Amino acid sequence: MGRSLKKGPYCDPKLLKKIEKMNQNNEKKVIKTWSRRSTILPQMVGHTIAVYDGRKHVPVYITEEMVGHKLGEFAPTRTFKGHGHHTERSTALK
């Protein structure tokens, strides 16, 4: 379920404070965050945010189309290696 409109979008206060400070100083540094649940706001456009995927921080460059989505949507937590392949041993067992 989505968040109630009267509450507004959620963004981690620490992350928002860092973004506002960087916008005032005209800086463009990579910001590390563990807050995958934060909604991408218009103030974040143009910044690179390193989102934690459970193993490492994945750099995500924020564009206009991403506004309204969550940071976690752009840092996948699972890597699919593919299904098992036929080997010489498995075909010999048949």
Swiss-Prot record:
<dbReference type="GO" id="GO:0003735">
    <property type="term" value="F:structural constituent of ribosome"/>
</dbReference>
<comment type="similarity">
    <text>Belongs to the universal ribosomal protein uS19 family.</text>
</comment>
<comment type="function">
    <text>Protein S19 forms a complex with S13 that binds strongly to the 16S ribosomal RNA.</text>
</comment>
<keyword id="KW-0689">Ribosomal protein</keyword>
<keyword id="KW-0694">RNA-binding</keyword>
<keyword id="KW-0687">Ribonucleoprotein</keyword>
<keyword id="KW-0699">rRNA-binding</keyword>
<dbReference type="InterPro" id="IPR005732">
    <property type="entry name" value="Ribosomal_uS19_bac-type"/>
</dbReference>
<dbReference type="InterPro" id="IPR020934">
    <property type="entry name" value="Ribosomal_uS19_CS"/>
</dbReference>
<dbReference type="Pfam" id="PF00203">
    <property type="entry name" value="Ribosomal_S19"/>
</dbReference>
<dbReference type="GO" id="GO:0005737">
    <property type="term" value="C:cytoplasm"/>
</dbReference>
<dbReference type="GO" id="GO:0019843">
    <property type="term" value="F:rRNA binding"/>
</dbReference>
<protein>
    <recommendedName>
        <fullName>Small ribosomal subunit protein uS19</fullName>
    </recommendedName>
</protein>
<dbReference type="InterPro" id="IPR023575">
    <property type="entry name" value="Ribosomal_uS19_SF"/>
</dbReference>
<dbReference type="GO" id="GO:0015935">
    <property type="term" value="C:small ribosomal subunit"/>
</dbReference>
<dbReference type="GO" id="GO:0006412">
    <property type="term" value="P:translation"/>
</dbReference>
<dbReference type="GO" id="GO:0000028">
    <property type="term" value="P:ribosomal small subunit assembly"/>
</dbReference>
<dbReference type="InterPro" id="IPR002222">
    <property type="entry name" value="Ribosomal_uS19"/>
</dbReference>
